[in-house]
Amino acid sequence: MRITVIADVLGEENNGTTITVKRLINNLRKRGHEVSVVSAGDGTPSGEDGCYTVEKIDFKIFNDYVAKNGVALAKPNEEVLRAGIEKSDVVHILMPFPLGRAAVRICAEMKKPVTTAFHVQPENVSSHFGLQKSKAVNDYIYKNFLKGFYSYASYIHCPTEFIARQLRSHGYKQDLRVISNGVDPAFTPRRSPKPAEYADKFCILNTARFVKEKCQQDLLKAIPYCRHADKIQVFIAGEGPLEKRLRQLGEKLKNPPVIGFPPKEEL
């Protein structure tokens, strides 16, 4: 089958969406499918090796903020999108932003089957403005996503049952399929002795970008209230704009957290 995957984020593996998209593409190709990709450019000539590139959106004075948050949104290019879509049997679109919205309209015009995924919660958007707890704002974003993007698709991939429930409660009538994003085969259950310095500790591992919605701050703030606070050792694997803040919170703990972006083998 010829499949076109359209995703804004497809660069450094520093966020869950990028990791999920790359895993999807690699596994589809392993199963014999011909996969083309449309994403923000990285210098690769558009159309080479099935990779169609478009420019990133220029946020002007906010570019540094956007970069720190690991958010790269692609600028729609109708010519490139049509080239990437025209020979496909089905198109899978990851994000409900300008590139994805342009793509679903082109697919509707060209009568190409479309599947989508729900990887961006409205709270992920509103948190950048400190409004993640505003029901009115988040409800509006759910409606905006539905009207401008998801209404064009009959199928939505939901990574968790929680996401599926949220969509149903906000009026999404599509076929919602819950499929886990999965775990890299490198991570398998096994027992191994703890390093000596952690032998008597309750070790807690958190893996996520250092951003508000991942709630690492709440984890660190909660530890002093635990009965065994002096026995808890937290490992926070990732990167992001809140790293300095997490380190400041960690300094107050008896066992400061180990914070960084370790290689997969170490993780």
Locations of regions flagged by a protein language model:
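Short N-terminal targeting/anchoring amphipathic segment
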Residues: 81-100, 112-115
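Acidic anion/phosphate-binding donor-loop and adjacent secondary structure
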Residues: 183-200
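N-terminal subdomain of nucleotide-sugar transferases
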Residues: 1-45, 49, 55, 86
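Membrane-proximal helix-turn-helix segments that form the acceptor-binding/catalytic region
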Residues: 109, 137-155
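Nucleotide-activated donor-binding/catalytic signature segment of Leloir-type glycosyltransferases, i.e.
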Residues: 244-266
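Active-site proximal beta-strand in glycosyltransferases
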Residues: 3, 90, 107-127, 157
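Conserved donor-binding/catalytic core segment of Leloir-type glycosyltransferases
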Residues: 4, 195-225, 234-235
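Carbohydrate-associated surface elements
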Residues: 41, 162, 182
